[in-house]
């Protein structure tokens, strides 16, 4: 049993190191969910690329967390895997909406008083999905922090 504990501790330390590396990459590439009313196509192209890069790194980060959780509590790890899937789905939906804004940047302009219903719906959906992404990411991080404090700290 002691050998198992030593192996688990070593594996957790290795995973923890990988997680720290991914975390520092994420910190450098931090994505702001703040909505800017920029109406240039170039701005939205850059924003989309930044979000895609951020989501790719975030998925690697969350998958690493899920790997750590799976070593300790498979049930919680499976639930976290569902949360990762939802994060990916929300990110994909946000990128799709941002592509629509990229094609018609005036959608985001709140000063435009003659917006069509279509534009208003896209903007509303953008705000909704953007908020959902932010809230879901917070939820995942809080869940992991709690798991870390309760389960992982006692192993490390």
List the model feature ranges, each with a label.
Residues 1-23:
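Cytosolic juxtamembrane helix and N-cap/initiation of the first transmembrane helix
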Residues 2, 146-156:
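Short acidic DE-rich linear segments
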Residues 11, 18, 25, 54-57, ...:
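Interface faces of extended alpha-helical assemblies
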Residues 20-76, 115-139, 143:
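Alpha-helical segments in soluble extracytoplasmic regions
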Residues 35, 84, 130, 148-151:
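Prokaryotic Sec-type signal peptides and long signal-anchor helices
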Residues 69, 81-83, 156:
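Extended alpha-helical regions
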Residues 74-126:
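Long, amphipathic, charge-rich alpha-helical segments that form helical bundles/coiled-coils
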